UniProtKB/Swiss-Prot annotation:
This is Cytochrome f. Belongs to the cytochrome f family. Binds 1 heme group covalently. Keywords: Electron transport, Heme, Iron, Membrane, Metal-binding, Photosynthesis, Signal, Thylakoid, Transmembrane, Transmembrane helix, Transport. Heme binds at Y41, C62, C65, H66. It comes from Picosynechococcus sp. (strain ATCC 27264 / PCC 7002 / PR-6). Residues 1-40 form the signal peptide. The chain crosses the membrane at residues 290-309. One of its GO terms (molecular function) is iron ion binding. GO terms for cellular component: plasma membrane-derived thylakoid membrane. It is a single-pass membrane protein.
Length: 325
């Protein structure tokens, strides 16, 4: 005979199991039905390279999914002082009149994203350290650390490219006086930035933002168009029929009866985005060196002034001596 306590525990267990199953089912279904929606944006780098987004060769891992090379820029001060808030401005230029192929095959605007690798100790400045101007420039932006123990590696995106072609990162420099692991000196800064969707998923599968090519040599005998599922292109070869499936999005540029060679394009290339990298440097300046330099310059200026005054004095003495003579 079941007691009320056991019945209550049993009901809670059943509820927890149902919630877990529903959650997993929703996650799996969304990944299967809409795999392109979140593909090839900065957070995918966290999945494929959890330790660091920068390979030993210097390449940012985002380039594995975004195959087209595009321009990217980052502007930061040449040098900063300890515990200073400054702007790192990332520029991701592109032609805003162009639209990209979305996951469902329709056209839409481009999103942008970026990963900014700052030196150790540098991080996104807390809100209470931002000026009113900087708060306005970063309004609506959400910056995320690449990993819990890597505050200096920051990712953002996907966000609207029409609104954020320039992204302002509010950065706080470290203070060697409070952090003994930090030293004054010159440090490297690495940027990876993309606009638009990628061509390859982290699993290695191609997205619909690609140019698709024939898998065999032969003659195209049938082109079956399904607006929702894509297009099936049947190629008759010496070994039989081969069907190449083109997802919705790319435009088919071949016709029935056309001879085709393996590797020849079946569609246009719909990709209008791409990925870019930029490396730069920043100097964490020791204030004592600045004060010393200022004192040195002031000393030189005073010395020059004294020399000029002394020269004038000597000239007056010489002039007076000549008059007496």
């Amino acid at each position: 005979m079941k007691t009320p306590e056991l019945m209550a525990i049993w009901q809670r267990l059943k509820t927890a199991c149902l919630v877990a199953i529903a959650t997993f089912g929703l996650f799996f279904a969304s990944d299967v039905l809409f795999p392109q929606a979140a593909a090839a944006y900065p957070f995918w780098a966290q999945q494929t390279a959890p330790e660091t987004p920068r390979e030993a060769t210097g390449r940012i891992v985002c380039a594995n999914c975004h195959l087209a090379a595009k321009e990217a820029e980052v502007e930061i001060p040449q040098s900063v002082l300890p515990d200073q808030v400054f702007e790192a401005v990332v520029k991701i230029p592109y032609d805003h009149s162009q639209q990209q192929v979305l996951g469902d095959g329709s056209k839409g605007g481009l999103n942008v994203g970026a990963v900014l690798m700052l030196p150790d100790g540098f991080k996104i400045a807390p809100a209470d350290r931002l000026s009113d101007e900087l708060k306005e420039k970063t309004e609506g932006l959400y910056f995320q650390s690449y990993a819990p123990d890597q505050e200096n590696v920051v990712i953002i995106g996907p966000i609207s490219g029409d609104q954020y072609e320039e992204i302002v990162f509010p950065v706080l420099s470290p203070d060697p006086k409070t952090d003994k692991n930090i030293n004054y000196g010159k440090y490297a800064v690495h940027l990876g930035a993309n606009r638009g969707r990628g061509q390859v998923y982290p699993t290695g599968e191609l997205s619909n933002n690609n140019q698709f090519k024939a898998s065999a040599t032969g003659t195209i005998t049938n082109i079956a168009v399904n607006e929702a599922a894509g297009t099936d292109i049947t190629i008759s070869t010496e070994a039989g029929e081969v069907i190449d499936t083109i997802p919705a999005g790319p435009e088919v540029i071949v016709s029935e009866g056309q001879a085709i060679a393996a590797g020849e394009a079946l569609t246009n290339n719909p990709n209008v985005g791409g990925f870019g990298q930029k490396d730069t440097e920043v100097v964490l300046q020791n204030p004592a060196r600045i004060y010393g330099y200022m004192a040195f310059v002031a000393g030189i200026m005073l010395t020059q002034i004294f020399l000029v005054l002394k020269k004038k004095q000597v000239e007056r003495v010489q002039a007076a001596g000549q008059l007496d003579f």
